A protein has these predicted regions:
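Conserved alpha/beta-domain cores
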Residues: 1-278
Length: 278
């Protein structure tokens, strides 16, 4: 579950809410929205992705004029770097309070969190410290995932996996950063540069899946790839992805595709085993 729509609905910058003594607005609105979804799917887990507004998006909120103007907000002050910054930490703490309220006051312990756009292991460790100070301590009933969308996470996949309970591969941002391609560039898109099926991107995804499983954590993927390309979805199944998000209109088709791939894998394994016995 993404939280950006909650921020858009409130329409006010979190730090401006704090400065005007209205921090409870974010806590209450966010906790109410999360509670509605968490109750509907209980006891299945609801993984809430903490805010991932970029500076240009925050500037569009009331009180957002405090945001710096960045030339490239996509790789700017967002995600984990924002949470641990003295200029925004108190805003992140409001989000933590909302999560704690959902879990404590409503008993919805199926609510977990996911940290977007993390870049370093020390950043993750610091975010976890802040969360723990707000009563959100990582344990068997409260899991912390990260979005794996920055190449640094790929290069240190096992180290990151040792800090969290799950990876969610953000294939859109990962493709941009691995390939050095702006996905909004019509020229490069038309030339075929933005493609999650590129061998470099697939190698990065493979590394993340295998590192996650080596450390005993789950690995999922979100992005357009599995919905658009059946061969890409098949690749993910072969590599052992635990789950994938797809567009609503492709859910039934993708389920059949995954079932078919898994059946072929089982039959292939059985034939191989029978051949060894002979």
């Amino acid at each position: 579950m993404r939280t950006e729509f909650i921020f858009s609905h409130i329409g006010v910058h979190p730090m401006y809410l704090l400065r005007t003594g209205r921090g409870e607005v974010l806590i209450n609105d966010m906790s109410q929205a999360i509670t509605t979804v968490a109750q509907a799917i209980y006891p299945r887990p609801l993984v809430v992705r903490m805010s991932d507004f970029r500076t240009n998006e925050f500037r569009g909120l009331e009180g957002g004029e405090v945001e710096p103007e960045e030339n490239n907000p996509m790789i700017g002050w967002r995600g984990g770097s924002r949470y641990i910054s003295p200029a925004y930490e108190e805003g992140f703490r409001l989000e933590c309070k909302a999560i704690k309220k959902v879990r404590d006051e409503f008993g919805l312990i199926n609510v977990w969190v996911m940290l977007p756009f993390v870049r370093t292991t020390w950043e993750v460790a610091r975010v976890k410290e802040i969360m723990a100070s707000e009563g959100l301590v990582q344990n068997k009933s409260f899991k912390i995932w990260i979005m794996a969308e920055v190449p640094a996470v790929v290069f240190q996949a096992e180290e990151f996996a040792g800090l969290v309970d799950g990876f969610s591969i953000g294939s859109n941002d990962l493709t941009q950063l691995v390939m050095g391609v702006d996905r909004d560039s019509g020229i490069l898109n038309n030339m075929g540069y933005f493609d999650e099926r590129d061998p470099s991107v697939k190698n990065a995804i493979k590394t993340l899946i295998h590192a996650a499983h080596k450390q005993g954590i789950t690995c999922s993927i979100c992005g357009q790839g599995p919905s658009l390309y059946p061969d890409f979805a098949e690749f993910l199944v072969h590599e052992g992805i635990d789950s994938m998000s797809v567009n609503p209109d492709t859910v039934a088709y993708t389920r059949r595709l995954v079932a078919g791939v898994e059946q072929r894998m089982i039959l292939g394994g059985m034939r191989k085993l029978m051949g060894q016995e002979l």
